Amino acid sequence: MLKNYAVTIAISSIAAFFLLYFLFAYSGIMLSVESGYQIGEISRWCERISSGYFREPSNALSNIGFILTGIFMVWILSREEVTGQNFFIGFTSISVLYASASIFLGPGSLMMHGTHTVWGQWIDNVSMVAYIIIPWLLNFKILNGWSENQFLAAYFFILISFSVLSWFFGSELGIDFSLFGLSTVSYTHLRAHETELH
């Protein structure tokens, strides 16, 4: 069963990420400096830009916290029994998706702060959207009686659409639209509406 290997899969995925990161960084293929900045200057994220494997070492490596939190979630979920009422107890598709999105936040942000590349910024935005749309869509699932398959279909449709569109048109999709901002505002309004219903 997959849940017996979940922690091993999560740790192996992160180990592969760091191995590839260091191989590409060592080869010089993927490191850059954000436009308008130079090595030794202070970045817009308040850290001096380094010439090492991580352009912003503290900002990049602080994302290990997301990775460890996600792996810890996977470890707990793989040991719990599914209750049927709470989507976040036991090894359910939604709980695993949430833990995976937490893990993904780490490499996503690390790529931005570590590489200073346009695609590093892109994957950072994708990882944030991957995480924030889960509670947003979960409220739609609850309020509209969606099945898990409907929830997952909507999630991956939004995430893939955002990923492709933001690659070609930027994170505001070329129309000054912030899916991340919309997600946080919509989530707040949905929670307020849900509270009124109870």
Language-model segments: residues:
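Alpha-helical transmembrane segments and their membrane-interface exit regions
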Residues: 130-136, 183-190
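Single conserved hydrophobic/aromatic residue that forms the stacking wall/gate
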Residues: 189-192, 196-198
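Early transmembrane hairpin module of multi-pass membrane proteins
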Residues: 2-175
